[in-house]
From Swiss-Prot:
Name the UniProt record assigns to this protein: Ubiquinone/menaquinone biosynthesis C-methyltransferase UbiE
Molecular-function annotations in GO: 2-methoxy-6-polyprenyl-1,4-benzoquinol methyltransferase activity; demethylmenaquinone methyltransferase activity
Functional pathway: Quinol/quinone metabolism; menaquinone biosynthesis; menaquinol from 1,4-dihydroxy-2-naphthoate: step 2/2; Cofactor biosynthesis; ubiquinone biosynthesis
Record field: catalytic activity: a 2-demethylmenaquinol + S-adenosyl-L-methionine = a menaquinol + S-adenosyl-L-homocysteine + H(+); a 2-methoxy-6-(all-trans-polyprenyl)benzene-1,4-diol + S-adenosyl-L-methionine = a 5-methoxy-2-methyl-3-(all-trans-polyprenyl)benzene-1,4-diol + S-adenosyl-L-homocysteine + H(+)
GO terms under biological process: aerobic respiration; menaquinone biosynthetic process; methylation
Pfam families in the record: Ubie_methyltran
InterPro entries: SAM-dependent_MTases_sf (IPR029063), UbiE/COQ5_MeTrFase (IPR004033), UbiE/COQ5_MeTrFase_CS (IPR023576)
Highest taxon listed in the record's lineage: Bacteria
NCBIfam families for this protein: MenG_MenH_UbiE, PRK00216.1-3, PRK00216.1-5
Record keyword Transferase present: yes
């Protein structure tokens, strides 16, 4: 489970894959990973999920069911390439507005290029900022989404508290993330796929194996479904629930600001 802890020298440590690193060091390491894979990020997700991430993202949008009006505002965090935000805008019949926030400029650059090509720029705002210190006043958004990004945040509890702060009363949090497999046979297959196949395919596709190795390890260090639900509740959210997909390979967590 990802959690900050005190190191032998009194500093705060967290997990970077299977390594323990200083809390302040993790963000730079994660940024380097995503600078390397930004232009092939969607291919990376295809490799890591055998294409299933597209189905899971569709399930997130179905759960969100964005309102079809111009006043509906969504904050999509760690959403640099725009994949979730584009789906939200289309599901709202191009009426909603999405703010895409990412700490990585390379990822945002890809998203902005894609938005222009899709003709969605008027519905989108791109912001380079940290999920742990959102540059928005309280009670601004109707929904907060984050897909396959929360496990890369050094202080997940802080990010969840920030999500709660910027949501309006009645606003909804939706977190899609790789999670703990619930089926023993699938678990063994998934381990083999993750640790042996994914880094190899990653190197073939992008020339880089290390980013994929980190991402695989980071999944194993992320809290399981129940523990992450407890973290969301601790941040102040109500009616917290989760839905497993593909035997628990991924899970969608939901919470409300009441």
């Amino acid at each position: 489970m990802v959690a900050s802890r005190t190191s032998a020298d009194g500093g705060m440590e967290t997990s970077y894959g299977f390594r323990d690193v200083a809390e302040g060091e993790k963000q730079g390491l994660v940024n380097d990973v995503f600078h390397k894979v930004a232009k092939r990020y969607d291919i990376m997700n295809d490799v890591m999920s055998a294409g299933m991430h597209r189905v899971w993202k569709d399930a997130l949008i179905a759960a969100l069911n964005p309102r079809k009006d111009a006043g509906y505002k969504v904050l999509d965090v760690a959403g640099g390439t725009g994949d979730i935000a584009f789906r939200i805008i289309e599901a709202s019949r191009r009426l909603a507005h999405a703010t895409v926030l990412d700490i990585n400029g390379s990822m945002l650059g890809v998203g902005q290029e894609r938005a222009q090509k899709k003709g969605l720029s008027d519905n989108l705002t791109f912001v380079e900022a940290n999920a742990e210190a959102l540059p928005f006043e309280a009670n601004q958004f109707d929904a907060y989404t984050i897909a396959f990004g929360i496990r890369n945040v050094p202080r997940i509890d802080v990010a969840l508290s920030e999500a709660y702060r910027v949501l309006k009363r009645g606003g909804r949090l939706l977190v899609l993330e790789f999670s703990e497999v619930q089926m023993p046979l699938l678990d063994r297959f998934y381990d083999q796929w993750s640790f042996k196949a994914i880094p190899r395919f990653g190197k073939m596709i992008t020339g880089e194996a290390e980013p994929y190795q980190y991402l695989v390890e980071s999944i194993r260090k992320f809290p399981n479904q129940q523990d992450f639900a407890a973290m969301i509740t601790k941040a102040g959210f109500s009616k917290v629930s989760f839905t497993n997909y593909t035997g628990g390979i991924a899970a969608l967590h939901s919470g409300w600001k009441i």
